[in-house]
C-alpha cells in the first residue's frame, strides 16, 4: 500500500465513524471532532477516544481508557497487531464502556 492509498482508506474509516456517530440516537451525548488527521470522540462523562494515523507505518492507532492499540490493514479490515481483534470490535467495546450504553459502528 502506498501513502496515498493509506490516506484514502484512513479518511474512509474516519468518515464512517463520523457518520455512525451523527446517526446515533442514544441517551448520552457523544461528540466527534477531526483535526489534523486525528479523530477525537468525547463522551458526556468527559472521557475520550483518540484515533490517529501513523503514516510511516501505514497503521491506525486507537487510544482508549482501556489502553492503546495499533492496527494494520489485512484484506479489508483493520486488525490489531497484538490481539488480532478488528478495529470496529475494539472501538465498539471502548465506546460502549465509556458511553455507558451500547454504541455500534456497523
Swiss-Prot record:
CDD domains: Frataxin. The keyword Iron applies. One of its GO terms (biological process) is iron-sulfur cluster assembly. SUPFAM superfamilies: Frataxin/Nqo15-like. One of its GO terms (molecular function) is ferrous iron binding. Involved in iron-sulfur (Fe-S) cluster assembly. May act as a regulator of Fe-S biogenesis. This is Iron-sulfur cluster assembly protein CyaY. The gene is cyaY.
Amino acid at each position: 500500500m502506498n501513502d496515498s492509498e493509506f490516506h484514502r482508506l484512513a479518511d474512509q474509516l474516519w468518515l464512517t465513524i463520523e457518520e455512525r456517530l451523527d446517526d446515533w440516537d442514544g441517551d448520552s451525548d457523544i461528540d466527534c471532532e477531526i483535526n489534523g488527521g486525528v479523530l477525537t470522540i468525547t463522551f458526556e462523562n468527559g472521557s475520550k477516544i483518540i484515533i490517529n494515523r501513523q503514516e510511516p507505518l501505514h497503521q491506525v492507532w486507537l487510544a482508549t481508557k482501556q489502553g492503546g492499540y495499533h492496527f494494520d490493514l489485512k484484506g479489508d479490515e483493520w486488525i490489531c497487531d497484538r490481539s488480532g481483534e478488528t478495529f470496529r470490535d475494539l472501538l465498539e467495546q471502548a465506546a460502549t464502556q465509556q458511553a455507558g450504553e451500547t454504541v455500534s459502528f456497523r
